[in-house]
Curated annotation (Swiss-Prot):
EC main group: lyase
Annotated active site: 71
Documented EC number(s): 4.2.3.3
Species: Saccharophagus degradans (strain 2-40 / ATCC 43961 / DSM 17024)
Function description: Catalyzes the formation of methylglyoxal from dihydroxyacetone phosphate.
Annotated family: Belongs to the methylglyoxal synthase family.
Residue runs in coiled coils: none
Name this protein carries in UniProt: Methylglyoxal synthase
Single annotated GO MF: methylglyoxal synthase activity
Gene3D superfamilies linked: Methylglyoxal synthase-like domain
The reaction(s) this protein catalyses: dihydroxyacetone phosphate = methylglyoxal + phosphate
Gene behind the chain: mgsA
Domain of life from the UniProt record: Bacteria
Length: 154
């Protein structure tokens, strides 16, 4: 697939997601990095979003719960350029009924070349990177070229 350059803005749109056994860990991480996160727009799936807003006082736009489609809502926002960073504390020891949704979400994040953190250490690296406060040019799929090529064959 052809690619093109796409910019991540200096003020990032950050999605925050956590499986049930990781919600407190994510909340603790958000509290630790509240000052940095205040500089960005925050989004979260259902229960995680309510917990983070209540425990941190941060403004968090909430989607529906992950198992009910929230992971897919976040994925759709990634594919339309409305989410720039994904911080997803998932539980590697607990099988989830919506594992296919999780796999799809991580795939979309990889396709659209956005930073992904899956634990406190990787999230620390992302949030403390100088790039988090800067515009950043990355390679993304050239959807227009893709459609032009596909429709040529019709």
């Amino acid at each position: 697939m052809k690619s093109r350059t796409g910019a991540l803005p200096s003020r990032k749109q950050i999605a925050l997601i956590a499986h049930d056994n990781k919600k407190q860990e994510l909340s603790d991480w958000v509290c630790t990095h509240k000052k940095e996160l205040e500089q960005h727009d925050l989004f979260a799936t259902g229960t995680t979003g309510y917990k983070l807003a209540a425990e941190t006082g941060l403004k968090v736009e909430k989607y529906i719960s992950g198992p009910l489609g929230g992971d897919q809502q976040i994925g759709a926002k990634i594919s339309t350029g409305e989410i720039d960073v994904l911080i997803f504390f998932w539980d590697p020891f607990e099988p989830m009924p919506h594992d296919p949704d999780v796999k799809a979400l991580l795939r979309i994040a990889a396709v659209w070349n956005i930073p992904v953190a899956c634990n406190p250490a990787s999230a620390d690296f992302v949030i403390t990177s100088p790039l988090i406060k800067q515009s950043y040019e990355r390679q993304i799929p050239d959807y227009e070229a893709y459609i032009a090529e596909r429709t040529k064959k019709l």
